[in-house]
Amino acid sequence: MGYYYWDPTYILVVIGAVICMIASARVKGTFNKYSQLRSMSGMNGAQVAQRVLQAAGIYDVQVRHVSGSLTDHYDPRTKTVNLSDPVYNATSVAALGVAAHECGHAIQHAKSYAPLSIRSALVPIANFGSMLAWPVILIGLLFNTRSSGLIIDIGILLFSAAVLFQLVTLPVEFDASRRALVMLRTQGILADDELRYTRRVLKSAALTYVASAAAAILRLLRIILITNGRRRDD
C-alpha cells in the first residue's frame, strides 16, 4: 500500500485558488451581463478610448485591437491601449468601461502616477522572485548547513517581492477605474444610469486583483509555516 502525506498548509493554497476562481467567474459573468446593454451614445470601445485620451491631452498613445477575450491592457513600453474582441468594436456599457479603464492607465503613465511607476519597476524583480523563490527555499531545506537558514530567508524575500507587486497593483487598478468613470461622466459618454452598470463591471474586475493579492499572501504564509516548521525540527 502506498504512503500518502497530507500537508495541512495545502489548505492555504486551496483557499487562494477558490477565491481566484470565484472572482474570475464573477467578472466574466458581470461583463457578459452588461455586454448585452448597448450604450445610448452608440460609440464603440475604440472610439471611447480615443475620446478619453484626447480629453486627457494625450496624443502619443495608439489604440490597437488584440485578439482574445478580456485581454485588454495598456502597454507603457509601446504606449498602446490594446482592446480585445469584445471591447474594440463593441458599444456596450461594459465594453466602454473597460476601454476607458485602460485609458486610465495611460493617463497614470502620462502623469507619472507614483504607484504605477513603482509597479513598473517591480515587474522584473517580481518575475525573478516568483521564478527563483521555491528553488532557493528547497535548496535551503534539503541541504542542512549553517547557511541553510540564510538561504531560506533569501527565498522568502524573493517571493515577498512577488507579493509586493500584487499589493502595489491594487491602488493602480482602483485609480484607473476612478479615472475612467470620471472621464465617462464628464465627457458625456455614458448617462448616470449607464455609469452605475459600468461601475459594477469595473468593481468586479478590480476584485480579481484583490483575489490575486490575497492568494499570493496565503502562499507566502504557507512558505513561512513550512520553513518555520522545518527549522523547529532541526
Residue ranges, per PLM feature:
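Post-HExxH zinc-binding segment in Zn-dependent metallohydrolases
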Residues: 123-148
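N-terminal, Lys/Arg- and Ser/Thr-rich interaction peptides
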Residues: 10-26
